[in-house]
Every structure is written in C-alpha cells, then in structure tokens.
C-alpha cells in the first residue's frame, strides 16, 4: 500500500506529515527506498502482515531538506525515529550514481544541495 504524504506542517520544532490514509497499526521498518521513475522516496512501514510505503514526492523534498534536525511525526501519531538516518544513507548512495537516471540524480543533488 502506498500512503502519499500530501501535507507537511512545522510546529514546536516538529515536522508533522499527513496522509489521507490511516496508519493505525503500522510501525516503522527503518528502510528508505527510491522510486526514481516517479521522483519519490518511499519509507517502509509494517503492520505485521504486509508492508506499506510512505511516499514523499518531489514537492516534499525541500521541506525535508530544510528540516533535517526536526522530529518527523505522521498523522499526529507515529514518530519516524530512523527517517533522517535512512534519508542521509539514500542521498549518499544517489550522489553521482546515474543508475537512478541522470535527471533524477541531478534533481536530487540540486534539491538537497549535494556536491
């Protein structure tokens, strides 16, 4: 199941991210995947039976980049404690790696100020 983050707010030094779908019963796996065809990052969640993916599309990337030290909470209930570490790992892997596609890599490098 793909759960799209469609709203992000900052309050009290916390990044609140919202999806229209329920996240009840889901917990974080601590793994970030890349959907380079759709210019998105997918953060893996699990309900004990199947995986779900929080989708952070390109329009959310600037907020993620500008708020790397803030806690991330989904739908006011689930804190993603490993999100920033996983995002950093993925960004390090994407840097200069055209296996993701040159245009995708260039967009990520520009958005996240990767040199």
Swiss-Prot record:
Organism: Staphylococcus aureus (strain JH9)
Family recorded in the similarity comment: Belongs to the UPF0738 family.
Classification via Pfam families: UPF0738
Name the record gives this protein: UPF0738 protein SaurJH9_1003
């Amino acid at each position: 199941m793909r759960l799209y983050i469609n709203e992000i707010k900052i309050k009290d030094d916390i990044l609140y991210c919202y999806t229209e779908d329920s996240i009840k019963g889901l917990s974080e796996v601590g793994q970030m995947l890349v959907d380079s065809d759709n210019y998105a990052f997918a953060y893996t969640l699990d309900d004990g039976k199947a995986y779900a993916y929080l989708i952070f599309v390109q329009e959310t990337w600037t907020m993620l980049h500008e708020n790397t030290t803030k806690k991330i909470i989904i739908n006011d209930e689930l804190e993603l404690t490993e999100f920033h570490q996983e995002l950093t790992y993925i960004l390090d892997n994407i840097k200069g790696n055209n296996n993701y596609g040159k245009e995708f890599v260039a967009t990520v490098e520009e958005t996240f100020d990767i040199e």
